[in-house]
From Swiss-Prot:
Residue ranges constituting the Protein kinase domain according to the UniProt record: 15-293
Annotated spans, Disordered: 363-389
Cited function: Ser/Thr protein kinase mediating a primary step for phototropin signaling in guard cells. Essential for stomatal opening.
Descriptive protein name: Serine/threonine-protein kinase BLUS1
GO-annotated molecular function: ATP binding; metal ion binding; protein serine kinase activity; protein serine/threonine kinase activator activity; protein serine/threonine kinase activity
Length: 487
């Protein structure tokens, strides 16, 4: 006998908002209780219809998709209704938030591999179900994978999902599963090559690519670089946030030191997902049979090793908002500039190094790039293909260079003010060293413990202490002078 579906009220008065737990460009997510349902805790996604890029029909499609799908790894919508100029979507509350928030708050260098396998297998179950139902998700990433305190994992956010076919046989005797989508949707970091070049069309395998990028995101703590900000923007971001845009510096550097080791099965699985040719990528169903998932742990394992010590979703959101406010908002011009670069500098391909689980983007040549390469450049290009451990050039490091300007394999950059950049980076390095010294002084003062330091670090701290004392004396002198004048 079918179980009766709970009927949630379609009235805002029936819900009591507790706190905000997420925010986006056109939507906010709240923790709330449904009063008529014995104060059941729910999540409410409030979409501003005036701010949303999607039209009302698209939003209705999202909520319809969420309500019709039934799978333990899919986040269902209980109901949806309009409140003033907002669409409220009532959903289950996932107390640990998204995998993105978990990784960024507690595992910035990436999750342990045995935990990654659990999260990925649960997500893959959801993708397999979606594809069986004729749906592409089109925006698979850690931010759309939600986790509850019991370890349950649910794939969410169907704002850009699409039905690629009706799972029935047409009158001609062939299914319409061969239909391919051509509109661009999703987040640039996770976009499959065929989605970027959407004029060629794409299908279910685009989700498999995004799944592979998500695996890298969980392994390294962030997705691979997808666009190159200009030099000014890069330096500004380094100074303001210390969130380096040059992904390869952080990841390949740590790999060389041996800090991150990945099993052969994991590397092979990711490699299959990141095949350039979508026809060579396995289906979600086939991928579930890969050896990487064979000895996968249970949900209780991630509860014990990942979730038990985490802050809850509302605390993580509050902490993230405090961090954002502390570093200040980015300049609007910079954001517009970066958006334009994302638009105009889409990736044309990827170079995947399976040995250290790294993915480097390849960008199409710009108008300023020469259409013909010199023999020397062609030789260098051949060398680069033969050597997996080539020197990272200024282009790859995100210094705002064109592809042509960064061809030199020895790191030499043409048409680039190297001295100016070096000068700015040295100033930044010095500033960071002084900040580190100050932090060490504060830690020592609060804890009473003395860390083992190198001679250079001791000298830096000594200089910093003298500076602080000098600043204090200056303030005392100024106050004394002011008092004498007033007296």
């Amino acid at each position: 006998m079918a179980r009766n579906k709970l009927e949630f009220p379609l009235d805002a008065e029936a819900y009591e908002i507790i706190c905000k737990i997420g925010v986006g460009v056109s939507a906010s997510v709240y923790k709330a209780i449904c009063i008529p349902m014995n104060s059941m805790v729910v999540a409410i996604k409030a979409i501003d219809l005036d701010q949303s890029r999607a039209d009302f029909d698209s939003l209705r499609r999202e909520t319809k998709t969420m309500s019709l799908l039934s799978h333990p790894n899919i986040l269902n919508a209980y109901c949806s209704f309009t409140v003033d100029r907002c669409l409220w979507v009532v959903m289950p509350f996932m107390s640990c938030g998204s995998l993105h928030s978990i990784v960024s708050s507690s595992f910035p260098s990436g999750l342990p591999e045995n935990c990654i396998s659990v999260f990925l297998k649960e997500t893959l179950n959801a993708i397999s179900y979606l594809h069986d139902q004729g749906h592409l998700h089109r925006d698979i990433k850690a931010g759309n994978i939600l986790v509850d305190s019991d370890g349950s994992v649910k794939l969410a956010d169907f704002g850009v999902s699409a039905s690629i076919y009706e799972p029935v046989t047409s009158s001609s005797g062939t299914t319409s599963s061969s239909l391919r989508l051509t509109d661009i949707a999703g987040t640039p970091y996770w976009m499959a090559p065929e989605v970027v070049h959407s004029h060629t069309g794409y299908g279910f395998k685009a989700d498999i690519w995004s799944f592979g990028i998500t695996a890298l995101e969980l392994a390294h703590g962030r997705p691979p670089l997808s666009h190159l900000p200009p030099l000014k923007s890069l330096l500004m971001k380094i100074t303001k946030r210390f969130h380096f845009s040059d992904y390869e510096i952080n990841t390949s550097g740590s790999s060389k030191k041996g800090n991150k080791k990945f099993s052969k099965a994991f590397r092979e699985m990711v490699g299959l997902c990141l095949e350039q040719d979508p026809t060579k990528r396995p289906s979600a169903e086939k991928l579930l049979k890969h050896p990487f998932f064979k000895n996968c742990k249970g949900l209780d394992f991630v509860v014990k090793n990942v979730l038990h010590s985490l802050s809850n979703a509302e605390q993580m959101f509050m902490e993230s908002q405090i961090l954002i406010k502390s570093v200040g908002d980015d300049d609007e011009e910079e954001e517009e500039e970066d958006e334009e670069i994302v638009k105009n500098r889409r990736i044309s391909g990827w170079n995947f190094r399976e040995d250290d689980l790294q993915l480097s983007p390849v960008f199409p040549a710009t108008e300023s790039d020469s259409s013909e390469s010199s023999p020397r450049e062609e030789d260098q290009s051949k060398d680069k293909k033969e050597d997996d451990n080539v020197t990272i050039t200024g282009y790859e490091l995100g210094l705002g260079l064109s592809n042509e300007e960064a061809k030199n394999q020895e790191g030499e950059v043409v048409g680039f003010d190297k001295d100016l950049v070096l000068e700015k980076l040295k100033v930044l390095k010095k500033s960071l060293e002084h900040q580190r010294a100050r932090v060490s002084i504060i830690i020592e003062a609060l804890s009473g413990d003395k860390e083992e330091k190198s001679r250079e670090e001791e000298l830096l701290e000594m200089v910093e202490k003298l500076k602080i004392e000098l600043e204090t004396e200056k303030l005392k002198t100024l106050r004394a002078d002011k008092d004498s004048v007033l007296g």
